[in-house]
Swiss-Prot record:
NCBIfam families per UniProt: HAD-SF-IA-v1 (TIGR01549), HAD-SF-IA-v3 (TIGR01509), PGP_bact (TIGR01449), PRK13222.1-2 (NF009695), PRK13222.1-4 (NF009697)
Protein name: Phosphoglycolate phosphatase
Pathway in which the depicted protein is active: Organic acid metabolism; glycolate biosynthesis; glycolate from 2-phosphoglycolate: step 1/1
Cofactor needs: Mg(2+); chloride
TM helices/strands, residue ranges: none
InterPro entries assigned to the protein according to its UniProt record, in alphabetical order: HAD-like_hydrolase_sf (IPR050155), HAD-like_sf (IPR036412), HAD-SF_hydro_IA (IPR006439), HAD_2 (IPR041492), HAD_sf (IPR023214), PGP-like_dom2 (IPR023198), PGPase_prok (IPR037512)
Enzyme Commission (EC) number: 3.1.3.18
Pfam family, one: HAD_2
Amino acid sequence: MAELTAIRGLAFDLDGTLIHSAPGLAAAIDQALVAQSLPAAGESRVATWIGNGADVMVERALRWAGVEPTAARVQETRERFDSYYAQTVDSGSTLFLQVKETLAQLAQQGVPMAVVTNKPTPFVAPLLAGLGIGDYFSLIIGGDDVIVKKPHPAPLYLVLGKLGLRASELLFVGDSRNDIQAAQAAGCRSVGMTYGYNYGEAIELSQPDVVLDRFADILPLIGHSSSHNQEPLV
């Protein structure tokens, strides 16, 4: 595997990259739909709606259920979703394989790291803490922390400014076209993980700089050694 040179910092998407969050999100969306006498969508379908933030996910759910997503209906459904998600976020979220171990090694080796997600900000830090990885990040940017979300480059510009990095020095790791497009627009290099959601599309179609199946392969990619062997993704 060829190394990416001159990388001094890493930023990570959250849902579909660091955590498998579809179960918790789907449970909350389905409860919000059923509470309005609408059909439940199910986890496999909801997983294809993840990536653009809660409002867009709610809009997609309403359209799928045959309901016009007016501003009032979206707000009502979003409020229901937020209430239900507060109950399902912890039990319905797990780390993907190799994530915690790899982040720990990167932190030990002094690599500054950020999370950049479109997820509503109030859920992000508690979720990271609950999964035992919150302390690895010097910067956390949620969907409510910027005026425009990914795929706009604004969140990555904020990372560059806060971490004092040039665009060429930041590597953004994500699982969806929004992540890759944001990195490309910001002038950063990108890694596309194959195991995420990405609206049911292959991440290769978005042309990231590197495509990886295993999270731990980030270490040799940026010239860092792994302290122990890790199991491959299955």
